[in-house]
Amino acid sequence: MKTLVFHIFIFALVAFASASRNSAKKIGSQYDHYQTCLTELGVTEDDLFSIGEVTSGQHKTKHEDTKLHRNGCVMQCLLEKAGLMTGADFDEEKMRENYIEEKGLQPGDQRIDFLNSCMEQTKDIEDKCDKSLIFIGCVLMNEVSLPASNEEA
């Protein structure tokens, strides 16, 4: 019985540590052009929001507009360098293909609907930086809302 309780405790600890590590990561930090975009825009990693700040909505309430805009510009730079965005326009088909491949999704996965919804919600935003941050925030918040068994593989 002690062994079973110990294994359950270790499993819970590992799951919590993994979730905490992901929420502490900076948005966009997993992508190839991350450092390039930071350098081009004169932004430091300390200026960027963590995934946890975005998924909890804290990025909207605890930061001034200039920090929001800088974060959005970094996201736009990453999307543009990946060929997913030109100026303030998404390449929606390429965005879908890239997202499906990156996440290993199957047809009918709810995350594809979320992605489409986020693109629809942001389509009329003209400022490319604001549009990018709002879009990324929408996608991240939707992913967090899914049950654990439906998240990233």
Curated annotation (Swiss-Prot):
GO cellular component: extracellular space
Role according to the record: Colony queen number, a major feature of social organization, is associated with worker genotype for Gp-9. Colonies are headed by either a single reproductive queen (monogyne form) or multiple queens (polygyne form). Differences in worker Gp-9 genotypes between social forms may cause differences in workers' abilities to recognize queens and regulate their numbers.
Organism: Solenopsis sp. (strain B0-178)
Pfam families: PBP_GOBP
S-S pairs: 37-77, 73-129, 118-138
Similarity annotation: Belongs to the PBP/GOBP family.
GO function term, MF aspect, one: pheromone binding
Keyword set, alphabetical order: Behavior, Disulfide bond, Pheromone response, Pheromone-binding, Secreted, Signal, Transport
Record note on quaternary structure: Homodimer.
Residue ranges of the TM segments: none
Annotated InterPro entries: PBP/GOBP (IPR006170), PBP_GOBP_sf (IPR036728), Pheromone-bd_protein_Gp-9 (IPR022354)
Main localization (coarse): secreted
Record-given protein name: Pheromone-binding protein Gp-9
GO biological process, one term: response to pheromone
CDD domains: PBP_GOBP (cd23992)
Leader sequence residues: 1-19
The keyword Signal appears for this protein: yes
Taxonomic path: Eukaryota, Metazoa, Ecdysozoa, Arthropoda, Hexapoda
Coiled coil spans: none
Localisation: Secreted
